[in-house]
Every structure is written in C-alpha cells, then in structure tokens.
C-alpha cells in the first residue's frame, strides 16, 4: 500500500514540478508588407503549466488573477527580410524570451487570448525558409 501511495505522490509531484513554465523553441513566421512574402525564424518563448484556480465565491479583498506562463525577461533580435524593394525597410525585429515565469498576462505587450493568428500565420502565399 505504501508503494502505491509513493507512486501516486511521485506522479503528482512530477506533473506539477516538471511540466512547469519554461523556455521552448518555436518557429514564427515574419513578414514585411513591402516585401510581399514571409520567412520562418527560430526563436524561444515560454510554454508550460502554471498553478491557478478559479474561486467559487468572489472576494473583493482578493482579486482573482489567473496565472499564465509568460516571459520574465526579453531580448530583441533583428532579421533582414530578403527580396524587399530598395526603398523599403527590410529589417524585422522580434522578441526572444530568455527567462519565464508564472504570472499575470500583460495585455499591453502580449496577446493574452486564444484568438491570436498563431506563429505560422502569413498574409502572403509564399513562405521562404
């Protein structure tokens, strides 16, 4: 019986601790309207699970904040989009997460919804790797 309890608690600990908020590699599609096509760029972003709860009874003294896996530190990198017209700005700057945390999503700098276009969305039909 003790071994079953140990296995249960170990699995719970593993699920909580090891699937936390951490850096992950992603590929995003970047585009410049003047260039008329997209390129794929590898970067890092935050993904994982954060402990959160939704209270049954609302308490005005304790605001209900849903925690999400989001960046703590960012740097920005710049890539040149090939094929742009000579007069067009061909540089594209994108964020790269360097540290993650479980916290409130900042809607001023982040798309906090599930309705975003997604990292592989391209307005144009041609994507260059």
Swiss-Prot record:
An individual GO BP term: regulation of signaling receptor activity
Residues annotated as glycosylated: 25, 42
MF terms (GO), sorted A to Z: follicle-stimulating hormone activity
Protein's UniProt keywords contain Transcription: no
Entry keyword set: Disulfide bond, Glycoprotein, Hormone, Secreted, Signal
Signal peptide annotation: 1-18
Tagged with keyword Acyltransferase: no
Entry's Gene Ontology cellular component terms: cytoplasm; extracellular space; follicle-stimulating hormone complex
Pfam families: Cys_knot
Subunit structure, as described in the record: Heterodimer. The active follitropin is a heterodimer composed of an alpha chain/CGA shared with other hormones and a unique beta chain/FSHB shown here.
Family: Belongs to the glycoprotein hormones subunit beta family.
Function per UniProt: Together with the alpha chain CGA constitutes follitropin, the follicle-stimulating hormone, and provides its biological specificity to the hormone heterodimer. Binds FSHR, a G protein-coupled receptor, on target cells to activate downstream signaling pathways. Follitropin is involved in follicle development and spermatogenesis in reproductive organs.
Protein name per UniProt: Follitropin subunit beta
Species per Swiss-Prot/TrEMBL record: Cavia porcellus
Lineage: Eukaryota, Metazoa, Chordata, Craniata, Vertebrata
């Amino acid at each position: 019986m003790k071994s079953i309890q140990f296995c249960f608690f170990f699995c719970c600990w593993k699920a909580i601790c090891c699937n936390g908020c951490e850096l992950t590699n992603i590929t995003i599609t970047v585009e410049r309207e003047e260039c008329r096509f997209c390129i794929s760029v590898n970067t890092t972003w935050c993904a994982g699970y954060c402990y959160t709860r939704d209270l049954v009874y609302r308490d005005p003294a304790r605001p209900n904040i849903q925690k999400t896996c989001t960046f703590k530190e960012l740097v920005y990198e710049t890539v040149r989009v090939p094929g742009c017209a000579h007069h067009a700005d061909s540089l594209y700057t994108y964020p790269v997460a360097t540290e993650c945390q479980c916290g409130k999503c900042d809607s001023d700098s982040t798309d906090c919804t599930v309705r975003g276009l997604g990292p592989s969305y391209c307005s144009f039909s041609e994507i260059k790797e």
